[in-house]
């Protein structure tokens, strides 16, 4: 996310913070017990938006366009140490900007006539690099959360400090309006494993309060929020989810999995009154702040189906984008995409459709990544993780989308899942299809062996690594998930 769980290389919420160096619990229950501990596999907001009858396409239409304005004057930047990424001329000292574009790069004595007499900016030896590319993030969920209060471990080492921040937020919020926090992670923040309604009642009893766990598959709320949702001891657990309860069977404010969280979140009026396109534009601005100039969504359609394309178009039409945007459509929506006649490469330099995303397994920290060997201490049918798509179906999907000209991106975390992905691409290559033609990828590619690297090179496949998970989950991988040798 950029995954908002710090699983992505760009964390749109916090930039590049330092986190505590050790986990309080190597694999806390709220992660290890969750069969969908990766937001790109199961989007928690989709159910809440459906229940709240929120139409993202309608929100997109409310986005104002930027007024026409004069183009900035030409600018010659000098005195720089420019890393060009051009092997023929790897270093330069100046560049010329015209009409908002870099028109020339080189050494000052070679500057074109157009550079004469224009405004100058002397960088006094500072280093300039090309903009960074964020290859795997999920824009609509980030946009939904961009104005929630960050109470995560990058800001607060303890749950008490996080709750104090929520208290400040509540005092600055009109009575009756929602106070929403995000990024809470009890595996890294000292204090209780869960934020119960009693703890959140200490934040406020005049506001509904809701907090998203950093996994996005666990939520916590106060008594006011439970009352708004009509949740009491008689409320049954939604299918595939759980309402946390105390010893007497009364709801304790802990909501496990999307359907349970949606029962509460749907009542947040900001869902309907917000503008997700504005949120997307804000995320682009946050990306710019850490040097990112192009972002790619890897799972379009899993949030609110084809309506997400309306959001992207409104972002483009606003004339206010500050970074380029690319996206891969989700295999889960294959029938709808085929019905709409979508093709690879449609769009322009600002917004373009570039990939077809297939999720083949789960997440390693959630013990659902498909592995050659069983997870530590795991038994039963899912001891080796889970395949989210049958092998023959994966083979067929890869072949079909390669024939259509798509850049196919296969989500594969476990080594067995990577084996299956490589096999699918290899079978297609035997049939005359070239995975390298569109730079096909294996997303996450987490548990990778040497022979798999060689096979990827042979097939012309690129890995898109979950860099953040090494920092965030490394100790858990060693101690509780894989063991030292595999980790």
Language model features: what each stretch is:
Residues 282, 286, 420, 465-470:
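A glycine-rich, aromatic-flanked flexible loop/lid motif
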Residues 438-449:
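Aromatic- and carboxylate-enriched substrate-binding clefts and catalytic-loop regions
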Residues 392-396, 419, 423, 440, ...:
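Feature representing long, continuous alpha-helical segments
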